[in-house]
Amino acid sequence: AVVIVATVRALKMNGGVAKDNLAEENLDALKAGSANLLRHLDNVAKYGVPAVVAINRFPTDTEAELELLRDLCKEKGIDVVLSEVFAKGGEGGMELAKEVINICENQKSDFHTLYDVNDSIEDKMNTIATEIYGADGVDFTADALKQVRELEKLGLDRLPICVAKTQYSFTDDPKKLGAPKNFRITVREVKVSAGAGFIVALTGSIMTMPGLPKVPAANGMDILSDGTIIGLS
């Protein structure tokens, strides 16, 4: 089973709400932003695996907002479960755990991939872009195409593809939220991670390392004189 984690806040942001206003109830924005979640649900369905949506609940989430999400997901035959692990510890995840067990025991999984690893790099990337991101297609820069040809000569082109792309959007532009249509993905660089066994296609201005926020959490961690560790939460 696949667990898709979502938050009311993130979906409202995808619906156009400014960060400072995310604590306010906004059903219209939530419904608009939920197009992002629904596309993720469609994507999981393409792999033939049953899913459940786990709402990572915040204190500002209203019952009306949670009910709206339940209704939207129910239309696709997907159950919504609240996850309150952060506030309640393990107890807050019991409902989700039970639902995952229920799905595994009572729903069939027919997992399959969307492309054959023996397809060309261009074809594999096009499948990812059109089937998962909802793009119209893929454009490779001249440098990226040259790198593709080099991988073909080395016999390293028959590997799965890992796309390095902004996490904020289905496009390669982090500002295009929701579930955009009528766009193309541009691959600017292609390289191979031979040890890991996959090809990396870089898009937009994404960096593959370091995967850290502007202020890493480690900056707030410390060990007191008595050995107590602070700043982990």
Regions found by a protein language model. Name each.
Residues 4, 53-55:
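Structural beta-sheet core signal
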Residues 29, 168-233:
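C-terminal effector/interaction modules appended to NTPase cores
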Residues 30-33, 37:
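Aromatic/hydrophobic pocket-lining residues that form the small-molecule binding cavity
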